[in-house]
């Protein structure tokens, strides 16, 4: 049986109808925007959604390896390994990736926001950005719990190193900033180095 929540959300995705010499074609709005090299991360970061974003990044690179990709982020975060799969692909492909926070970029969402092309990481004025250390839970034998605790510590260190790379901050500064949930306005995120600028209006196209 189809998940009623999925059905509800999918039924609200608008369709765009285009006319051409070959007739009429209909696209869902996200597929139409993908043609303009625009990708969305909306909602929690998880394996299935991350795989779709990775596939879109690879497809757009194959289409044109030098043309910019715009990555819009509105996410509360989610699974660390899923987020890292997107992050690694962003760094792997040859296309520059512009990131833009609309709404919120929390946890892994903030890391992906910061991972955009230097000078091309943006947020809208009322966006909220939150950074913190990874969390997790595990039940089982004491030895297994210790193994998982060590894995979380290793992930924490790696995430700190990634934030250091993209913000230019010292490791200790990042370590302290991520000890607890750390919410920022767009202005604070810019000062911290997570973004490069705040966009109030879309820039006018350059005159021909």
Curated annotation (Swiss-Prot):
Keyword check for Protease: yes
Family annotation (Gene3D superfamilies): 2-enoyl-CoA Hydratase, Chain A, domain 1
Keyword Protease included in the entry's annotation: yes
Coiled coil segments of this chain: none
BP GO terms, sorted: protein quality control for misfolded or incompletely synthesized proteins
Compartment(s) of residence: Cytoplasm
One Gene Ontology term of the molecular function aspect: ATPase binding
Active site as annotated: 107 (nucleophile), 132
Reactions listed under catalytic activity: Hydrolysis of proteins to small peptides in the presence of ATP and magnesium. alpha-casein is the usual test substrate. In the absence of ATP, only oligopeptides shorter than five residues are hydrolyzed (such as succinyl-Leu-Tyr-|-NHMec, and Leu-Tyr-Leu-|-Tyr-Trp, in which cleavage of the -Tyr-|-Leu- and -Tyr-|-Trp bonds also occurs)
Enzyme Commission numbers on file: 3.4.21.92
Keyword field: Cytoplasm, Hydrolase, Protease, Serine protease
Cellular component GO terms held in the UniProt record: cytoplasm; endopeptidase Clp complex
Pfam families: CLP_protease
Principal location: cytoplasm
InterPro entries: ClpP (IPR001907), ClpP/crotonase-like_dom_sf (IPR029045), ClpP/TepA (IPR023562), ClpP_His_AS (IPR033135), ClpP_Ser_AS (IPR018215)
Physiological role: Cleaves peptides in various proteins in a process that requires ATP hydrolysis. Has a chymotrypsin-like activity. Plays a major role in the degradation of misfolded proteins.
Family: Belongs to the peptidase S14 family.
Subunit structure: Fourteen ClpP subunits assemble into 2 heptameric rings which stack back to back to give a disk-like structure with a central cavity, resembling the structure of eukaryotic proteasomes.
NCBIfam families named in the record: PRK00277.1, PRK12553.1
Name of this chain's protein: ATP-dependent Clp protease proteolytic subunit
Source organism: Methylorubrum extorquens (strain PA1)
Lineage: Bacteria, Pseudomonadati, Pseudomonadota, Alphaproteobacteria, Hyphomicrobiales
Record gene name: clpP
